[in-house]
Amino acid sequence: MGSRLSPEANAEVPREALSFHGDATGAQVHLDDQRSTARRRSTFHDGIVFSQRPVWPGERVALRVLRHEDGWCGGLRVGFTRLDPAQVAASCLPPFVCPDLEEQSPTWAALLPEGFVRAGNVVCFWVNRRGWLFAKVNAGRPLLLRKDVLVQGAPLWAVMDVYGTTKAIELLDPKANAWITSGEPMPESEVTSGEECVICFHNTANTRLMPCGHSQFCGSCAWHIFKDTARCPMCRWQIEEVAVEPSVKSGEGS
């Protein structure tokens, strides 16, 4: 099993470039010879892949969406896991990272908003020392996906699910694009209020899904999600109520 990671003690240790683990892959995954590209052969599931080594808190995992396939609902999932892929038989991997792998192991992942996973987009994601999972697309602002990743006590591997509309992805070197590693994550108050809806990228995010509390959606998109799947696209919790944020609502029309 992997050893404990200490960012303070190992900040200057050279890191091996990230690639996909060659053996622990979903049943529909095909990797190229360099293990930098993962493609889902068919259907919409069985696309789980892992990084070949543990990832440090704050380290960016960067990838490019190579191919988008219409006809499915939802796309790429990203996150982190304490599950060492070297100890996992590919035949034992479930079809989905959310919720299957999360229920079977200490794994924390989230669905990326639809606008993130268009072909050609560069996505990077990371977890900070507080256990907050962030992602951003191209040179955009960071989006807080969840706040419950356990970063102490065991290594974390990056996990991705080449799911649904996302047909193929390619891992990139974060150092090749300065914007990937630049900038600190925004405070929670800036991430979760008053921004554009992360689904339509047009209307103001003024609606909160309950009970999970994610509030990165406009009212129209939130109700569409509620009627379609009734699960939060960020954390997959069951939606029981859609609530308009009072602070945003009071400012409408002013």
UniProtKB/Swiss-Prot annotation:
Pfam families: Neuralized (PF07177), zf-C3HC4_3 (PF13920). GO terms for biological process: innate immune response; positive regulation of proteasomal protein catabolic process; protein ubiquitination; ubiquitin-dependent endocytosis. InterPro entries: B30.2/SPRY_sf, Neuralized, NHR_dom, Znf_RING, Znf_RING/FYVE/PHD. It comes from the Eukaryota. It is found in: Cytoplasm. The keyword Transferase applies. It comes from Rattus norvegicus (Rat). Residues 17-174 form the NHR domain. It is an enzyme of class 2 (transferase). Pathway: Protein modification; protein ubiquitination. GO terms for molecular function: ubiquitin protein ligase activity; zinc ion binding. This is E3 ubiquitin-protein ligase NEURL3. A zinc finger (RING-type) spans 197-236.
